[in-house]
């Protein structure tokens, strides 16, 4: 799964450039044969505006949200894109400057205001961004573009028009929700975010949003908290990007990357600052793993711990013979990986990109196993008896259960990230295959498949081509777990038609078809296939 290619020409820089939205869809040139069951839309989100007037955005997660869509109908394909008209975007375009502080870019008061107006503008409270550039997913019959704050944005996925801004704080005790919910077959949505818990301490709430209502009312209005996880530190919640869910349990990994709440609140009231300034990490704090029963929502007060790591994406999580098995795209050590995702780093020449990545945390795919009955064995003995994994769990004298992982994949500066599975068939179940985007020193340059049982890998890769997260679509009559296709948007800057939707056979990553358009697209993070 290690990349075969170097990138001295620096074509990857093109995926970090501003794009214009389209007034109408562009027809795509199709090579190969689009599978007959693909009759829907591939929806993707990512940054598309990397400066406001003369003011640049500095971090990968600052660019304003651009929504992309490839439409498929009877073998014909079109491409369309529009900016999500968030408050952050509209005000940046209107005022030609950064108006709302983003992840790594600080907004300053309007220079046209007098000194007294500028002074008092610091004391109006925190203005949280609604820049929903990370993902899109359904809630009931509607679709929402999302980031990781309390705001989600309702969009029309047919026209890509922006419909409504929704503040989740109006419905549940939550400071923000992740862009990676779990969605059950009936449409029930589960998500996680930090909140103010008991005793004026920070905590983490699992939120449940019910499926489509019979009376067609908005399911968000019936959102509720189902269980709460405590925070290891009272005023420093961990950064949370995703969580695990089995049929009967929630799994939450609390990493040593913390948000300093006092620093966060003072950042806007005292001095110009951004979200990145409020993170801190400490290797000695290690990583805590929490579990809770799903029905009823009940926190299980076992003290599972492991060494410090960074974490963004869970791959899958399932129960087996009294154990919970969960697979992660981990990053070794305590340092925050986002420290290496400044646009200046990502746009650097190839040799500099490699030098920056060499000092960053090392990525690897890990499997951890949690014993649901950790007190059945004596102290110091391995509690894991599953025959197919080398992951261990041991009880320590202080009552904590120490977890050591099995490494499923590790390559030098070669990440398996943005993981996908056959979600409908195997989410929350024992499974075999994961699909991911391969990062070569943080440059996305291949699509990967991993057999988590045998550690066998497959790779799709072409020179000077930069794909996105692969989305799995199951064949309608598919029986095997990998009966289906992968869909990814690839940017090949030197080509006549530099962007294409690539369709791969999920069995062996062989190409089935591609739909090319004569336009460049910037990087995208996550998305979905809407049948």
Swiss-Prot record:
It is a lipid-anchor. Palmitoylated. Fe cation binds at residues 180, 241, 313, 526. PANTHER family: BETA-CAROTENE DIOXYGENASE, RETINOID ISOMEROHYDROLASE. Belongs to the carotenoid oxygenase family. It comes from Danio rerio (Zebrafish). The gene is rpe65a. This is Retinoid isomerohydrolase. InterPro entries: Carotenoid_Oase (IPR004294). GO terms for molecular function: all-trans-retinyl-ester hydrolase, 11-cis retinol forming activity; all-trans-retinyl-palmitate hydrolase, 11-cis retinol forming activity; beta-carotene 15,15'-dioxygenase activity; metal ion binding; retinol isomerase activity. Plays important roles in the production of 11-cis retinal and in visual pigment regeneration. Capable of catalyzing the isomerization of lutein to meso-zeaxanthin an eye-specific carotenoid. It catalyses: an all-trans-retinyl ester + H2O = 11-cis-retinol + a fatty acid + H(+); lutein = (3R,3'S)-zeaxanthin; all-trans-retinyl hexadecanoate + H2O = 11-cis-retinol + hexadecanoate + H(+).
């Amino acid at each position: 799964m290690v990349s075969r290619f170097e990138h001295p020409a620096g074509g990857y820089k093109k995926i970090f450039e501003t794009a214009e939205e389209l007034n109408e869809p562009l027809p795509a040139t199709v090579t190969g044969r689009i599978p007959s069951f693909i009759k829907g839309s591939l929806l993707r989100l990512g940054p598309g505006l990397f400066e406001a007037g003369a003011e640049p955005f500095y971090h990968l997660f600052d660019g304003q949200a651009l929504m992309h869509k490839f439409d498929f109908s009877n073998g014909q394909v079109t491409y369309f894109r529009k900016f999500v008209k968030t408050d952050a975007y509209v005000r940046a375009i209107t005022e030609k400057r950064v108006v709302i502080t983003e992840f790594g870019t600080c907004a300053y008061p309007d220079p046209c205001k007098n000194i007294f107006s500028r002074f008092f503008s610091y004391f109006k409270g925190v203005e949280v961004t609604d820049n929903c550039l990370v993902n899109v997913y359904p809630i009931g019959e509607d679709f929402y573009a999302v980031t990781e704050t309390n705001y989600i944005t309702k969009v029309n996925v047919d026209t890509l028009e922006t419909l409504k801004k929704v503040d989740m704080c109006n419905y549940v005790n939550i400071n923000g929700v992740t862009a990676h919910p779990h969605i059950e077959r009936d449409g029930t949505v589960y998500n996680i975010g930090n909140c103010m818990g008991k005793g004026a301490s920070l905590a983490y709430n699992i939120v449940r949003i019910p499926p489509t209502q019979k009376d067609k009312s908005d399911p968000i209005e019936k959102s509720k908290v189902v269980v709460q996880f405590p925070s290891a530190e009272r005023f420093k919640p961990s950064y949370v990007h995703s969580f695990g869910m089995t049929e009967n349990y929630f799994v939450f990994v609390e990493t040593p990357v913390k948000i300093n709440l006092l620093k966060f609140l003072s950042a806007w009231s005292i001095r110009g600052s951004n979200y990145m300034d409020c993170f801190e990490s400490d290797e000695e704090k290690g990583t805590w793993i929490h579990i809770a029963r799903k029905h009823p929502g009940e926190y299980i007060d076992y003290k599972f711990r492991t060494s410090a790591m960074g974490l963004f994406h869970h791959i899958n999580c399932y129960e087996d013979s009294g154990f919970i098995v969960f697979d992660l795209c981990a990053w070794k050590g305590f340092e925050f990986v986002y420290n290496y995702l400044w646009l200046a780093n990502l746009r650097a020449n190839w040799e500099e990109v490699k030098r920056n990545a060499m000092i960053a945390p090392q990525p690897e795919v890990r499997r951890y196993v949690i014993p649901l009955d950790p007190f059945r064995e004596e102290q110091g003995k391995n509690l894991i008896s599953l025959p197919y994994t080398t992951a261990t769990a041991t009880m320590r004298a202080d009552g904590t259960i120490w977890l050591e992982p099995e490494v499923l994949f590790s390559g030098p500066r070669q990440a398996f990230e943005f993981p996908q599975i056959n979600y409908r068939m195997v989410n929350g179940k024992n499974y075999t295959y994961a699909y991911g985007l391969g990062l070569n020193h943080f440059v996305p340059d291949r699509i990967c498949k991993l057999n988590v049982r045998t550690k066998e890998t497959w790779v799709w890769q072409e020179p000077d081509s930069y794909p996105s997260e692969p989305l799995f679509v199951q064949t309608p009559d598919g029986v095997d777990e990998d009966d289906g296709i992968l869909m990814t948007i690839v940017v090949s800057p030197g080509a006549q038609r530099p962007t294409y939707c690539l369709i791969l056979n999920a069995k062996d990553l062989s190409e089935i078809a591609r739909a090319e358009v004569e336009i460049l697209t910037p990087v995208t993070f996550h998305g979905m296939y809407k049948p």
